[in-house]
């Protein structure tokens, strides 16, 4: 079962709402976006994402994918990307795989809770409640966060929040 919700939060007044969309996530994760670990046998491709109406002053973007329902006591970070140039407004399907080089120049994918940089698809435990997968794009007031691909999700999140102008999210629920 997969449901999709869209949310947007802006730190400043704007005539247009900062939004995040995906041509790939129109109601459910398909096998190509599911992880290929922990008993899941998906294709582990990151979804296509697009955003628009970034606030004035945006100098870069960051993207995260987070599962707050993971049975860890602290959730699970599936994807962390930052230093996406301000003139980029989408990521192609599969951009989360560094080997295919679809990520914009200068963008950095840092460590996830899988212990490596790059996209790690959803794979909730069997027979668990539906998990929320929150994909968020952040409009930032700095061009570079000043960290590299070895940064932990917590450190990236801290620096993102210090530089936040606006954010928009997709929330997808998935159950195995």
Predicted features by range, described:
Residues 1-10:
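Bacterial N-terminal signal peptides
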């Amino acid at each position: 079962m997969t449901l999709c919700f869209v949310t947007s939060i802006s730190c400043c007044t704007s005539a247009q709402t900062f939004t995040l969309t995906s041509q790939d996530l129109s109601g459910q994760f398909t096998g190509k976006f599911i992880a290929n670990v922990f008993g899941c046998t998906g294709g582990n491709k990151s979804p296509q994402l697009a955003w628009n109406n970034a606030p004035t002053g945006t100098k870069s973007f960051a993207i995260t994918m987070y599962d707050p329902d993971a049975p860890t006591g602290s959730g699970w970070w599936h994807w962390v990307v930052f230093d996406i140039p301000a003139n980029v407004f989408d990521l192609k399907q599969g951009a989360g795989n560094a080997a295919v080089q679809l990520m914009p120049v200068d963008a950095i994918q840092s460590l996830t809770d899988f212990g490596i940089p790059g996209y790690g698809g959803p794979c909730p435990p069997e027979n668990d409640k539906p998990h929320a997968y929150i994909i968020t794009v952040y409009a930032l007031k700095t061009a570079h966060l000043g960290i590299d691909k070895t940064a932990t999700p917590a450190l990236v999140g801290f620096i993102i929040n210090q530089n936040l102008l606006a954010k928009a999210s997709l929330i997808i629920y998935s159950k195995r």
